[in-house]
Regions:
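M16 family metallopeptidases and their MPP-like homologs
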Residues: 1-35, 55-59, 117-212, 224-232, ...
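Proteolytic maturation boundary segments
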Residues: 27-135, 293-295, 301-340, 347-348
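Peptidyl-prolyl cis-trans isomerase
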Residues: 44, 214-215, 219-221, 274
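Solvent-exposed, non-transmembrane alpha-helical starts
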Residues: 68, 141-145, 200-202, 217-219, ...
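Structural alpha/beta core scaffold segments of enzyme domains
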Residues: 113, 270-273
Length: 350
């Protein structure tokens, strides 16, 4: 009742109730608090104040506690009197990214089956970003591959014939390069964020990762554990359950087809079926630079990039012949589907 003496508090309370669905909830809550009984309070306490729903802290006194020292006082004026900032960053060109300017600046060339496009332009810190995509296989040759293609891509940076997993990461750090690898049916994509001077060496490292992976047993075990843990979590999430159901709804393809949408249980089975021998066999059969694309934008030397690509992929003209997997339109009958996700208060509508 005291809140009614403060118009600001009343306004905020009514606004919050309105956001929950009805501004009158504020008054309903007031009436429910007024009418609550001791028995109801006890019932709720017994229901919710259980050991699995609480965090317990224990105070353990000690005669000589070890405490971190207090922060030292700093004389800011004295600290700053000798400060000399770094030289201002060099100005870069004001490149206007119109279609005409992009076409005029872009240089294209081919390295074997690899089509390349580079756009040299000034950037802060000589930054450059690059993407490499290799394409392979078709719906028949990829049939039954399960989770093997994804596992191959996930383990590419876990060691090569000449570099351990730690050495790969050390090399990336030395080259000031961020690298990520992703995959989809019939392709693997590598993205790079680096600097002008390091781009050729980063391309050479990517070539080593793609051509000479060793697929360590420990890395495969780690991949399986992470994948199965993620699936176990998805089983409980409304959005993941809804997405999986929608993907499977009206899907006409048999299990094993790359367009088939697996259940959570089927995905776990496919993950468990992955072996190092299967990874090596898939890599030997499908990977190669016979079909692919490379693109780079930023502060770069086109001639140096071309030389690096030629050295890394010029003689790797192999891999299963690529044919794009068709995705024809599929007529799906409309239907309303309700799915239960126990212990989850949120919901997802698709």
């Amino acid at each position: 009742d005291q809140s009614f003496t403060n118009p600001e508090r009343v306004g905020i309370a009514l606004s919050e109730s309105g956001a929950q669905g009805d501004w009158r909830l504020f008054f309903l809550t007031r009436d429910r608090v007024r009418d609550v009984t001791l028995a109801e309070v006890q019932r709720v306490a017994d229901q919710y104040l259980v050991s699995s729903n609480r965090t317990l802290g224990t105070y353990l006194p000690t005669d000589a506690p070890v405490r971190a020292p207090a922060p030292a006082k700093v004389d800011l004026a004295k600290t700053m009197q000798d400060f000399k900032p770094q030289a201002a960053a060099a100005k870069v060109e004001a490149f206007v990214a119109t279609p005409e300017n992009l076409d005029a600046r872009t240089q294209t060339f081919a390295v074997g089956g690899l089509k390349a496009a580079v756009l040299p332009k000034g950037t802060r810190g000589a930054a450059v970003r690059a993407t490499l995509t290799l394409r392979f296989g078709d719906e028949k040759s990829l049939f039954g591959s399960g989770e093997v293609p994804g596992a191959v891509a996930a383990l590419l940076d876990k060691g090569t014939r000449t570099l351990t997993r730690e050495q790969v990461q050390d090399r990336l750090d030395k080259l000031k390069t961020e690298l990520s690898i992703g995959s989809a049916p019939g392709r693997v994509t590598v993205t790079l964020a680096t600097r002008r001077d390091y781009l050729p060496d980063a391309i050479a490292l990517v070539g080593d990762l793609l051509r000479n992976p060793v697929f360590p047993e420990a890395a495969l075990a780690e991949f399986k554990q992470q994948a199965i843990t993620a699936i176990a979590q998805q089983r409980k999430e409304p959005d993941a359950v809804a997405d999986n159901t929608l993907d499977r709804w009206g899907n006409p393809y048999p299990r094993g087809d790359v367009r088939y949408a697996s259940t959570f249980d089927e995905t776990v089975q496919d993950v468990n079926a992955v072996t190092v021998d299967k990874l090596r066999d898939f890599h030997a059969r499908f990977y190669g630079a016979a079909k692919g694309e490379f693109a780079a934008v930023g502060d770069l030397d086109p001639a140096a990039v071309r030389t690096a690509l030629q050295s890394a992929f010029g003689d790797w003209n192999r891999g299963a012949p690529y044919v794009r997997v068709p995705h024809p339109r599929v007529d799906v009958q409309p239907e309303r589907v309700l799915l239960e996700t126990p212990d989850k208060q949120n919901a997802t509508l698709l």
